[in-house]
Amino acid sequence: MPDTRFHKRAGPFTLAEVMAICDAAVADTFEGALDQQFSDVAPLDQAGEGQISFLDNRKYVGQFRETKAAACLVHPDYADQAPEGVIALISEKPYRAYAKLAQAFYPEAEGSRVVAATAVVADSAELDPSVSVGDYAVIGAGVKIGADTII
């Protein structure tokens, strides 16, 4: 999970929205849960209430069977092994689906520069418009800082 001090989390997303983002399906038993909301993504062994995880490697089937995630993106071969109460989001490519979902929860920041009031930036420094400079940082003369850098 990204550090929320640096990355803003979007959402929550409903099950219907998650299915659309990931191009995933659910078993008929969960069709009535399309309005259920999810707040984040997390690894199998760390996921909890309101969170979605994924299984893409049979090495982690044990963690999948024990997960406390609210839902889990899985290949159809593993869907029937989901723990009771865990929604199996069925995808032929669960890792790719999880990546899409993580991008939805943690979208790229819009390219707006943020420089803390306590930061010192030399007049000759060149900062990309997407750079963020935190409290008490010092950017010296002639320094060039590229896109999406957080200091």
Residue ranges and their predicted role:
Residues 1-118:
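Terminal amphipathic alpha-helical/low-complexity segments used for targeting or macromolecular assembly
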Residues 54, 114-151:
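Structural signal for interior beta-strand "rungs" in well-ordered beta-sheet cores
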